[in-house]
């Protein structure tokens, strides 16, 4: 799950190699910014390396929670298409067999506003499970349904289903995932409870 980067600076051919305990391009960029600030203040490179290698990231950002049937289980707070694209990039750069994205859209208004964009990015996962929309106190005045998203995803990827409860999603995942698959819950609502329950046993 680790990644490494080599440090170069203007006028200097090579500084050092640093291992990160987190994945994703955004974490590389954040690490480079932190390194630049540390070097500006003449902090020893070994101290920088030690700090970055022990950093495990923030909660709910491509957070590894454990395993289910030998499959890696992650959670991510992403709830906007651009954030989901970043999550997708992290998933695809992580070594695994098949991936399963469990997506819960956050609010009816956001769902209707970004319906096509959600479908476009989610269709790039191997398998997609749509969870019930999280209303967050909103009334569904747009009459948007989970099936609207499923239908759009199906135009690009037939491996998508809607399950109307977290319990059904958990049972489905436990029946289909195996060693070295990757499962990720995506959304700002309580969908992360699915990931937590999957790794309990």
Feature names for model-found ranges:
Residues 102, 131, 185-186:
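Short hydrophobic segments within beta-strands
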Residues 105-108, 134-136, 188-191:
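Short glycine-rich anion-binding loops that position phosphate/pyrophosphate groups of nucleotides
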Residues 119-179:
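C-terminal helical cap/extension that packs against the catalytic core
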């Amino acid at each position: 799950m680790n990644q490494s980067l080599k440090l170069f600076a203007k006028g200097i051919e090579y500084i050092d190699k640093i291992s990160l305990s987190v994945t994703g391009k955004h974490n590389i960029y954040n690490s480079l910014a932190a390194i630049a600030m540390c070097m500006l203040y003449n902090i020893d490179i070994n101290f920088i390396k030690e700090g970055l290698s022990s950093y495990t990231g923030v909660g709910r950002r491509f957070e590894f929670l454990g395993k289910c049937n030998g499959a890696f289980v992650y959670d991510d707070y992403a709830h906007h298409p651009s954030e989901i694209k970043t999550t997708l990039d992290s998933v695809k750069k992580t070594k695994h067999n098949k991936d399963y994205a469990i997506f819960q859209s956050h609010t009816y208004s956001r769902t209707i506003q970004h319906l096509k964009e959600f479908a476009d990015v989610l269709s790039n996962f191997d398998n997609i499970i749509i969870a019930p929309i999280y209303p967050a106190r909103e009334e569904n005045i747009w009459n948007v349904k989970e099936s609207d998203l499923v239908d759009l995803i199906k135009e690009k990827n037939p491996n998508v289903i809607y399950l109307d409860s977290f319990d059904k999603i958990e049972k489905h995942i436990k029946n289909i995932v195996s060693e070295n698959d990757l499962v990720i819950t995506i959304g700002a609502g309580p969908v992360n409870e699915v990931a937590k329950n999957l790794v309990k046993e």
